[in-house]
Amino acid sequence: MENIQKLIARYPLVEDLVALKETTWFNPGATSLAQGLPYVGLTEQDVNAAHDRLARFAPYLAKAFPQTAAAGGMIESDVVAIPAMQKRLEKEYGQTIDGEMLLKKDSHLAISGSIKARGGIYEVLTHAEKLALEAGLLTTDDDYSVLLSPEFKQFFSQYSIAVGSTGNLGLSIGIMSACIGFKVTVHMSADARAWKKAKLRSHGVTVVEYEDDYGVAVEQGRKAAQSDPNCFFIDDENSRTLFLGYAVAGQRLKAQFAQQGRVVDASHPLFVYLPCGVGGGPGGVAFGLKLAFGDNVHCFFAEPTHSPCMLLGVYTGLHDAISVQDIGIDNLTAADGLAVGRASGFVGRAMERLLDGLYTLDDQTMYDMLGWLAQEEGIRLEPSALAGMAGPQRICAAAAYQQRHGFSQTQLGNATHLVWATGGGMVPEDEMEQYLAKGR
């Protein structure tokens, strides 16, 4: 306890985190892209290479997953305006939201219905390509739909993949790995929803369940993989490959905005609100957004009050050396995808200069907004996916933050607020009804 008091003396905001208060922290260490980029350790070239790899796999994906065929084997989500929800939020919170609110529907991404379809699928494909190239079975000029042949399935069946997950990452990696022909084991934490485990098993995936939280599931997955030279462990806490799979979203969003005639520049700032668990998904997306929009995009991470691992790590500068459990927080939240007690040290250190801030919100707030969005826009998401929805009113209410960045009323009026909806497209009807019943 005395250690917590010492921490609070140095970092006063920790007191609010411990008290489970909804908290907003604006990052005093935020820099320009030019200053912050060298610390990421990855470059625009790396993201372009990921983009090219996904293009090579597009013919394969279009055939393996017919729901991606219309988009030519690209796994991408829509961006939609949510004016009725914007009005509802203004009414509920008594706070005007300047500019326009949009929703990025990663919740409805093909194959696995969450943001994890980006990173998870990309890393499985990267590994498959590497094995096939090394074995001389494939060249990068081939039509990758050959990977659907029995010979390739046979080849990949010698190898296995393991991952630890609270649910959505396991879903994307499990479904993709099984499709390619890998043997796959997903180590699921206690928070994982029963339907996600059942769906994985229906694809022939081995699911190992733990009574403990995310950190334990990842650790056990890592251990199990170490003893088998043919097993590849996808490390959600440290993977650069996952991170790059998410980062591709930046250029793609830029193209979507261009198609819609939406301007992002100094006088039309873009604010993006990303739900954060261990940090790989939002970190990778934020990195891609920064490369695409430079200093005109402002990224915020959103976490449950019971799992504020990234806010705690970045704010104190302790990163993965501290967990929410260390300050007496239980890491129990309805936002199962965000139930992580210790943030990725790689993501925290890579992105701490490129984030404008982080905030926390209560489970009940997520349930309330889940209900409002369903009522106002007819869009149904899982609780985690609503974490970003609280962002716009926090930013619009923050005069000191606006002054520090020199935002004028005109700029704020021209702003775009993009809420990144991370999952929910595959939630079973009965489960969704239970979520909706919890909103006020």
Curated annotation (Swiss-Prot):
Keywords: Lyase, Pyridoxal phosphate. It catalyses: D-serine = pyruvate + NH4(+). Pfam families: PALP. One of its GO terms (biological process) is isoleucine biosynthetic process. The keyword Magnesium does not apply. The modification N6-(pyridoxal phosphate)lysine is found at K116. It comes from the Bacteria. Its cofactor is pyridoxal 5'-phosphate. Gene3D superfamilies: 3.40.50.1100. GO terms for molecular function: D-serine ammonia-lyase activity; hydro-lyase activity; pyridoxal phosphate binding. Its EC number is 4.3.1.18. It is an enzyme of class 4 (lyase). The keyword Lyase applies. Monomer. HAMAP family: D_Ser_dehydrat (MF_01030). Belongs to the serine/threonine dehydratase family. DsdA subfamily. This is D-serine dehydratase. It comes from Salmonella paratyphi B (strain ATCC BAA-1250 / SPB7). The lineage of its organism: Bacteria, Pseudomonadati, Pseudomonadota, Gammaproteobacteria, Enterobacterales. The gene is dsdA.
